[in-house]
């Protein structure tokens, strides 16, 4: 059990028997009445988001979630297959549990897999990742009518808007939380 005042971003809680990841917490101390925390949580199975209000004096149940470092191997159609880097056992993560994550997975890269009640429920994607640009339209001088960015496709199929000077084959740093270009990366 965890007190409402101790809930922090990144904590995994049980709500109605399901695991939720706290993505945002705002502490509110009204002039009158008890202090409370407004907690925004993401369901770790289906990705739905809900906001809950918890009094700081109340207790909530925290979920026991294990994290395993694993190397991404391949996509078998229904699951993403990883190999635990310590035990070398295969870990299967259902695509239904992690919609949209395939664009951030590269064979051989390591990720943290969250396991709850023996089930792989989430893949922790690093906040910033480097990708190689697989496809980019050429930049034509003076072609700034449409703005100073253009869409490019990375090696994993992720489409990101980047400045016009980015060329095919270059490496770029992407913020995976906002899906935005950060900077060009030199080899």
UniProtKB/Swiss-Prot annotation:
GO molecular function, one term: translation elongation factor activity
Cited CDD domains: S1_EF-P_repeat_1 (cd04470), S1_EF-P_repeat_2 (cd05794)
InterPro entries noted in UniProt: Elong-fact-P_C, NA-bd_OB-fold, Rib_uL2_dom2, Transl_elong_fac_P/YeiP, Transl_elong_KOW-like, Transl_elong_P/YeiP_cen, Transl_elong_P/YeiP_CS, Transl_elongation_fac_P
Gene Ontology biological process terms, A to Z: peptide biosynthetic process
Disulfide bond residue pairs: none
GO cellular component entries: cytoplasm
Keyword Transferase in record: no
Keyword Protein biosynthesis: yes
Transmembrane spans: none
Location within or outside the cell: Cytoplasm
Keyword tags: Cytoplasm, Elongation factor, Protein biosynthesis
Family: Belongs to the elongation factor P family.
Role this protein plays: Involved in peptide bond synthesis. Stimulates efficient translation and peptide-bond synthesis on native or reconstituted 70S ribosomes in vitro. Probably functions indirectly by altering the affinity of the ribosome for aminoacyl-tRNA, thus increasing their reactivity as acceptors for peptidyl transferase.
NCBIfam families: efp, PRK00529.1
Protein name according to UniProt: Elongation factor P
